[in-house]
């Protein structure tokens, strides 16, 4: 069976390196392109802790798209890079998988229209870990019976966007299961601005950014005399690779 040819954008980022290793280690896939902002011409293998692989890092996206044979491009960069680069990728007839967060709903819809026009597949997910997907599904169901809820999400201190894409997706899913209402005391006030976190349809979300974390989230429900906490922890970035 012919292997699926995969390119990675953001190949030298934390997630990008993990994706490259996962692709190289999968018998059904072959890494044929690695796009990054540095290490031009260097073999991707040693840069991700593996032997030489034969694929060179390319810092010029135009050159990569012209020279590399790619079926699917995996993107873990940043929101602005996605908006700048993905239309060029899709115009080449390359399908795209996006794990980058920070895109607005309007931007996602715009990319969807561009993918449709280019007749390519586009898959965008806030989280590729099966445990995180289950957490969101369970939270959506729990909200039908326990509508008072807050979210605490915890990530490494290099993450740029807050709240996380997973938290935003969770909030939107929960919102489908409950009526919007203001939580907390009607006359509550903050002694320090932002103490109650961000708010979405009455639900509060809190973002923690510290060294040592990868990706974690608690969805806390409160009811009369009881609480329910649904938590997911990605202890390493390997947790995302089967989904990717």
Regions found by a protein language model. Give the residues of each.
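C-terminal substrate-binding/catalytic lobe of Rossmann-fold NAD(P)-dependent oxidoreductases
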Residues: 2-9, 14-68, 146-243
């Amino acid at each position: 069976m012919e292997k699926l040819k995969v390119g990675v954008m953001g190949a030298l980022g934390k997630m990008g390196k993990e994706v490259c290793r996962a692709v190289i280690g999968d018998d059904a896939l072959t890494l044929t392109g690695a796009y990054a902002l540095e290490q031009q011409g260097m073999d991707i293998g040693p840069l991700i802790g593996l032997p030489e692989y034969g694929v060179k890092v390319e810092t010029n996206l135009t050159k990569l798209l012209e020279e590399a044979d790619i079926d699917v491009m995996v993107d873990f960069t940043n929101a602005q890079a996605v908006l700048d680069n993905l239309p060029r990728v899709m115009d080449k007839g390359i399908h795209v998988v996006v794990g980058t967060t920070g895109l607005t709903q309007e931007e996602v819809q715009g990319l969807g229209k561009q993918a449709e026009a280019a007749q390519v597949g586009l898959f965008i997910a806030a989280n590729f870990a099966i445990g995180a997907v289950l957490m969101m599904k369970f939270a959506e169901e729990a909200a039908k019976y326990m509508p008072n809820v807050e979210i605490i999400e915890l990530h490494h201190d290099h993450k740029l966007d807050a709240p996380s894409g997973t938290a935003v997706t969770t909030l939107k899913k929960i919102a489908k299961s409950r009526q919007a209402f203001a939580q907390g005391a009607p006359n509550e006030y903050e002694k320090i601005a932002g103490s109650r976190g961000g708010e979405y349809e009455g639900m509060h979300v809190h973002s923690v950014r510290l060294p040592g974390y990868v990706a974690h989230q608690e969805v806390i429900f409160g009811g009369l005399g009881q609480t329910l906490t649904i938590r997911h922890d990605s202890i390493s970035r390997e947790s995302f690779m089967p989904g990717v």
